[in-house]
Amino acid sequence: MAAGFARSRQGIATVASLDQGVWAKTQADFGCHDFRDTDAGSMLRVKGSDTLAPVGPGVVTGWDFRNKGIRTLVNGIAKQDSTTAEMEWDMHYLVADIARTITLVPGDLLFSGTPAFSRPVQPGDIVEVEVEGLGRLTNHIVVGPTPIRTDVGAQPTESEEVISTAMGGDWEFRGIRTPSKDLYPSTVEEKE
């Protein structure tokens, strides 16, 4: 999910964080986790690369963020199925926490992240994110129009540790604790 702001917010209480002047959108939380080793401790390239933060299909005002269903489908199969009640920090808390030190201005978007059980996707996949009351956002995964340059900077990597971390493993135990594929079921049905 994404919260957007029609007026500035700074140093506000949690209870007032999502009062008037806030709107909501469905948001897909993509990441290019091949850059986790490149940006160790940072998510700049992992989450900030072009096209990784699609939002839509429209803007909803007066929407209550509490206890709403969130589902992610990949090629029509549910991969994530949760509610906002299961979020570690709800959107009210996230807005108030960020606004302690960063002034949120009109047009800013704050993303809540994704439910547990992230899954890798490949070119050709169709990813749909549904948020109760906000609608469905559909994304077609494609190869980017420009290859990543190899003559400058650290290059993307892929390893079991990177994949484990991307799917919810503990960063501080990378390379120490062997990743267990049993902890990361590939579908919602497998975890039940």
Model-found features: residue ranges?
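N-terminal accessory regions of nucleic-acid-interacting proteins
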Residues: 12-24
